[in-house]
Amino acid sequence: MTYTCKYCTKEFRKESTLTVHLCEAKRRYQQRDETGVQLGFKAYIRFYETTQGSARLKTYDDFATSPYYNAFVKFGRHLVAIRCINTASYTDWLLKNNKKLDYWCKDALYTEWLPDYLRREATQDALERALKEMQDYADAHPELQNGFRDYFRYGNANRIVYHISTGRISPWIVFNCAGGIEFLEGLDPGQTEIVLPWIDPDYWQQRFKDYLADTEWVKDILQKAGL
């Protein structure tokens, strides 16, 4: 009697050997629920929707046996690592601009996509993401006695600069609360140099005028939040 691996069809004499056996096909099946793998799977589906017009018949089994599996999983894990603020939009941008799959994990591509996305994204999305980021930061830093309300006032300036330059904190928030404005005024020249390209004051001040209702809505929420 032999025992057969249902993933690679290899046969074993002992059931215990089959149990500890880990072929590539089995490994891919076992990691199917990992966040990075799922993001890679979604990107794979979107790739086929964009290039072939439909991916209705594409299953995880199709993905796991695809020659593109490793490339898309690498990309999915990259999205997790960089904390991509909108994985679907970024994937669509890569496809629309015909970026080679082998290059999808390059930081330069994300940096190229991000500024335009921050200008186009829904105001509510920017606000919700920022408030969550502030709350997460406050949860990890109990020394902030007033929680996320102290984010701009007493948070680590370099960390906040990083949050702004990676899109975690949008100009919608920085420019529309007292804490954000005070934070910008207190930056040193090096920090200002990093932040400035991401907050583009001329552009955003005009946008706030063009979308006055959204601006007043954001200001009201941030004021009530104590920021």
Model-derived segments and spans:
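C-terminal recognition-helix end and immediately following basic linker
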Residues: 1-41
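Charged/polar, solvent-exposed surface patches and flexible loops
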Residues: 20, 24, 39, 46, ...
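Charged, amphipathic alpha-helical linkers/stalks
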Residues: 29-74
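Surface-exposed polar/charged interaction patches
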Residues: 47-54, 78, 82-85, 96, ...
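Extended alpha-helical scaffolding regions
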Residues: 60-137
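Long, mid-chain structured domain cores
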Residues: 108-176, 181
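Charge-dense, extended regions
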Residues: 148-227
